[in-house]
Each structure stands twice: as structure tokens, then as C-alpha cells.
Amino acid sequence: MKKILFTTVVLLVAASAAAQDWKDALKKIATTAVDEVTDGKLTRYALDGTWNYTGPGVKFEGGDIASEVGGAALETAVVKQLEKAYAKAGIRPGAGTFTFGKDDDAFTATLGSHTLSGTYEYDAPTHVVTLHFAKGKLNLGSVPGHAYISGQELVLVFPVTRLVEVVTALGSKVSYFSTATTLLSKYKNVYVGFAFSK
């Protein structure tokens, strides 16, 4: 009797988890499809609000990575290296937010103990978001990147070299990026940055 009860509980928990995974997957597929149909405008409207940092973000554009069997393994290795570099700068899951203003195109980012602000521009068809940082203690100027929303997840990514500049300015050591940049140096159109959720 106990074995039957235990098996039933395990099956119910597994079914519940699988249903949640399917629900999340369908939500991501739906938002991606609508975003493509609206030529990126869904992402523009969905950017507004506060996003909570969940971990490093990596985005490969183009076909060179997608066609490789090792693409997922490469992404995992890069994420692990980025986690180390971000931790050195005080950027950890739960210790960061990014807020995009609804009406004024302003943004505020809190990453670790650093708060950055400025304005942003978003080009819907290309998903290019350019952050214009306000002058302050860290003079970062304008940083172009890409923003992608899938379900309740935002991936905000930048060219590898620009991200190294930003995180270095926040206090991380460039040596922590050496493994990630070495892995990515042979690929074109590789963007790294941050993942957020609402």
C-alpha cells in the first residue's frame, strides 16, 4: 500500500512539473511568435517595468553556432565563466534589477552595489537597444546591445568586448573573462550579458 501511495505521489509531482515546463515552453513559443509577427514591437512594449537579475545571458545570432552540436555545451561553459566574473563585481541572482521607464525612455540598473541610469533607444525590427549612460562615477557612454523577451524572461546582451568594459568598470577583473572570450573569439555575432525575469 505504501509503495502504491509513494508511486502515485511521485507521478503526480512529476506530472505537475512536466505540465509547468510545457506551460512555460508554450508561453515562450507564443511570445516569440507574436514578437516575430509584430516585427519586434511586442518586445518594445514588454520591456517596460522592473526586471530581476537571474544570471548571465548568452545569445548566438546567425547559423554558425546553431548548426553545431556543441553549441549548448559552449553556452554552458560561457555562462559558468560569466557567473564567476559577475560574482567578482558583486552581480548575483537576486542582487540586481533593471527598470525600463514606460513614458520617458529612462532606465535604472542596480547590479550588485552599483546603480547606473540613463536613457535608452529600442529599434524593434533589429532588437537593438542602445543604453546611453548618464555621466557619473562610471563614464560608460553609449552601449549598443540586443533585448529579447521570451515568456517572462528578458535577455539583455552586448558584444563581448563592450560587456568586458562595463563589468570591468563595475569592479571585476578582466582575467575572469579570458576563458569566455577565448571560447567565443572564433564565432561571429555572439552576445553576452544578463538574464532577467519579472
Sequence positions of predicted segments:
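Bacterial Sec-dependent N-terminal signal peptides
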Residues: 1-25
